[in-house]
Amino acid sequence: VTIASPNHWHALQAIWACQAGKDVYVEKPATHNLFEGRKMIEAAYKYNRIVQHGVQLRSSIAIREAVKHLQDGLIGNVYMARGLVFRQRADIGNKGISQTPSTLNYDLWCGPAPMRPFSKNYVHYNWHWHWDYGNGDVGNQGVHETDLCMWGLGVDKLPERITSMGGKFLWDDCK
């Protein structure tokens, strides 16, 4: 089962797939929070299933070769990595509350997340920017950068410290 849904659904869908005897490939971020991640791991063990978390750069032949060169010492001893993303995201506006479209089962879409009055800013890509459904740009893009840094350094445990900087400098929207 491949899971590519809003973040707030990842854990339940993965657990249900394991219960159904299916292996799982889940897009980033694997879960919405740490508790859900632990429950996914428990389900994988309990039902003897494979649950794989996917990030973009792991599938790139060029990146795999670069990481191999890095780990083979081509540029010496690498002791620090920085993941940087400079991306302007478009203004999503302040669309406010509106009528749920007849083509959307909003209760099903919300699923395990709190039921909020419908807003066009909660669905489609914009759900990323609302904590009930997504993890902001850290969960949307930071996962890829963190993975690449850890992979390049050859570390298999979480970092002790991460620094993040950023802000909302341009748009006055509901992100």
Task: Set out the residue ranges of the language-model regions.
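N-terminal Rossmann-like NAD(P) cofactor-binding module of classical short-chain dehydrogenase/reductase
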Residues: V1-T2
